[in-house]
């Protein structure tokens, strides 16, 4: 009997100890993703894409939580100074952890690096929330120390595994693509980083996409962020041979991995509190379009600045011409050429100059605009609110003090003036809005300086903005206010040059500024917004075919040996044929939804194609032979077996399509469901 009592007591003791034992891990999990965190130090130790089975992060020993840069530097840069003073989250005291309602909150207090003698009075509260598609990271930094905080890495993922080593793994944005595996692109030079490193800037690049042919994940901000974020990948410990990733899991006892960080550039000063911009970590299964679908459907528009109307004339397929003038007579001459050559819109530069702090129109511009418009030619003026000529009269007195400077007080360049400066914001409105031509023209296209010379932020102490204020914040403020003030009537357009896709909430369209490899991505991100594509002399036919493929307006930029339109008869003829084709079959090619490659199969050498879906659900396939020398036989199959017809820019009457067609070099064909 005594033995039974002792056994029962021991059993209950074990159960009690088990019941009170703290869990070793904390999970956020749904049918899409599983994220596992260390319950003591807060490190992310596993991430699994449950739909594809991709173990994005799987080696627990590589778990990371956050990083923070606290530069320790004085005016003399003594031996005690250390600019690269990185606080690593996994080396801090264990955080306070709270879990509730699909969210985990980690609170780290008193931060210290290996180079600091004592803890800094800094609190970092990091939150991870489970969403229906993945994770959302947000946070708050409270700095009561004497040290500045330049960035916070959150999330910080210790490894991004390669899901299938038989195919490449890429990281890309709306304008760029690089390999992560098997070749890792070292963007910053061997002298500037500890490991091969590749970075992209958000929100300028819209999103970060990591993918192979079958799966991927997206990193992006849903709303326009306050701070700049630099996403970074590091190949640790380095290359197997030049530019090539190691295939092994370890090299000389060092774990091989690709480490990922989202670095929030906050430039927090002592005594400040900074809220991190929420950032999404979203997973998907499928090709790249599935990831872009998630981004474009999830991004929140700038409703506070959203454009009120879209001019109806911009909805039609139009042929544009980019010109530069010195006076009103030049514009009249170009207008007459446009009338003969089938050009609908003139995109005009050179129409103003800046002298002694004032923006001045060229002579005769207003009458010239009126004359062009009377002949049915629309006039759109190119603008650049915050770029000035350093050699112009009055530059030093009016603009030199407003150039943007880096953290060491050195100008990035001398022609981009700071858009975050209140005085410049007032100058832009007072000088540009007084110009009659801007109000008379059919619209304007503004060219922001697109971070020329790495001018991402300004650190001038006398510009009346926060040190390290992102350039984009000032640009967006000026762009929105100018668009509102110049709206005029429902037929006036405001256009940009694709600097950041949040501008599409302000502007009616944009001139694409990317390589032709990314035209389809730009079009897929917004299938209907007007996009213009520059056509230069030496690649004219290729570029016009790209415009046809991607539902973009042709913009002639013809100045190879002169600027007379009649001296480029073949280019003009093909451009007119494309516009006529798009007008004839507008329901298939223009008033239709771009669907990339989905819904059709095209076989043949040197071919590119795009699928369009009409409002009634019918499909059209545009096929282009990209070879400059060889014919190509295009075999096209649509999966529903309906009767098909085809037409070309040169022969626009539809003919029965019997499954294949021969395409001459640099030629196009449209296959349509009847």
Roles of regions detected by a PLM:
Residues 93-101, 105-115, 130, 134-136, ...:
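Conserved structural scaffold segments of CAZyme catalytic domains across common CAZy folds
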Residues 24-114:
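Acidic-aromatic substrate-binding/catalytic surfaces of carbohydrate-active enzymes
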Residues 365, 378-439:
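Active-site-adjacent "subsite" loops/lids of carbohydrate-active enzymes
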Residues 316-328, 349-362, 410-429, 460-474:
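The substrate-binding groove and active-site-proximal loops of carbohydrate-active enzymes
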Residues 5-13:
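Sec-dependent N-terminal signal peptides
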Residues 319-321, 346-348, 379-383, 444-446, ...:
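Hydrophobic faces of well-ordered beta-strands that scaffold small-molecule active sites
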Residues 42, 272, 476-650, 663-669, ...:
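Active-site-proximal substrate-binding groove within the catalytic cores of carbohydrate-active enzymes
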Residues 419-507, 522-531, 539:
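Active-site neighborhood of glycoside hydrolase catalytic domains
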